[in-house]
């Protein structure tokens, strides 16, 4: 225990340690451990109320000044030799703490001690924030940011000492002005306010408050991700959607009404159309016959008017000049010819009537021999007509060739003028005569519609659970991973966007553990091939976790194909592309 001014008696390089753990020395000691003392001391920054029983060994000059434990007598800058003490020491009186902590790499080390001082104190420039200091304090010159500044009562002068452009000594007080001085340098009986520094970016945006309000795009908070989906559409689009819904509803009602109707009415309409066509043909033939009769009557009427004019002129002609008038002779000659034709027709009709009356009188029935004979006569008649038609056709062909040769020789036209008529006739022959279409209620389904519906159903149905699958995946670095992975939607489908995932007969998907290499959880494009590839072959650019049809695919989509590579016919192996080699980078 040292008392007063002690210029110690410890030997150089050693310190006598008492059994209690305190060094004994007297006077102003160099290099000797001292016990706590009370009195006037300057700087007890590293002093401890119960110093540990340590021995310090020093060599050379200045051993006690920089290597001994601080005493609480009249000491100048005593430092703790080992680690910095973390307990608080109670000091009284006038204290100036400018101690240098040991084991520090920087000139200004910042220990974590705190002192409780009373009276007029100039608090340490190297200690932490003083706690509950009373009296006249020069507060916290260069305090460390370990703790915040506690409430100081009394007259406090000073603040955190900050450097120019940057804080050399960080402080809990942020409201500073000038060279580290507190903006409220003279605070009588009030607590020094502590505030956290507000970090603002470009435009004055506070990141501490705006970061909580930003919508999380990673999907960690579902309420923020749902806010984008629930955003109201513009009224124009809403009106269009409502009109579309109304139109679809009306079309569904029409479909229901049509589906409840029977096809018997349609078949009846078809029969009525056939009957009306027959009546129309009869009316057309009758109209044509009447047209011919009208034309004939016109000609006959004109001829009769001519004959009447001739008769009138013949009557007015004198009898001496009648030898030059031949019109009456021509008229009577034509009239006799007409009578002759009419008499022949009448004779034929009379014979038919006589035969009919004879058959009615004899009561004879038609035998099968008569029917066969009648059919033979009809057949012979058709053969004769066919022979005549053939001869006429040959004559027409000869005339056609002669006409074409005539045009070629005299007109210089080597083209066939009958080609247009021939193509028109061919179109007319190829056109179906019966214009009735297929029934709208056919039982045979449409293959394209069934395939499209099956594809949509497969894409929309949820996954039933992870199923193990085996396959080969070619990732972006073409690392092959052969093993079992967990696929999300069964065999033959895939999750796009996985690094190293394949759309084939199984492979590791994103987030699943696979036995092999070339499969990671990093989303990127993947060139995938495998057995039963049903999703996409080529480079896929899409987000992970969505269906196979929702991504933007750069490649050839092969739905429901079972080939190797880009897909083809069922169970048909094809050679891989030349550029997709395993060792290529």
UniProtKB/Swiss-Prot annotation:
The modification Phosphothreonine is found at residue 317. One of its GO terms (cellular component) is nuclear pore. It is a peripheral membrane protein. Gene3D superfamilies: 6.10.140.1350. Residues 194-232, 563-585 are annotated as: Disordered. Belongs to the NUP58 family. GO terms for biological process: mRNA transport; nucleocytoplasmic transport; protein transport; regulation of protein import into nucleus. The gene is Nup58. This is Nucleoporin p58/p45. O-glycosylated. Sequence repeats lie at residues 7-8, 30-31, 42-43, 61-62, 66-67, 474-475, 478-479, 499-500, 505-506, 515-516, 517-518, 531-532, 554-555, 564-565. It holds the Pfam family Nucleoporin_FG2. Residues 242-262, 300-367 form a coiled coil. It is found in: Nucleus, Nuclear pore complex; Nucleus membrane. Component of the nuclear pore complex, a complex required for the trafficking across the nuclear membrane. Keywords: Coiled coil, Glycoprotein, Membrane, mRNA transport, Nuclear pore complex, Nucleus, Phosphoprotein, Protein transport, Repeat, Translocation, Transport. One of its GO terms (molecular function) is nuclear localization sequence binding. Its main location: nucleus.
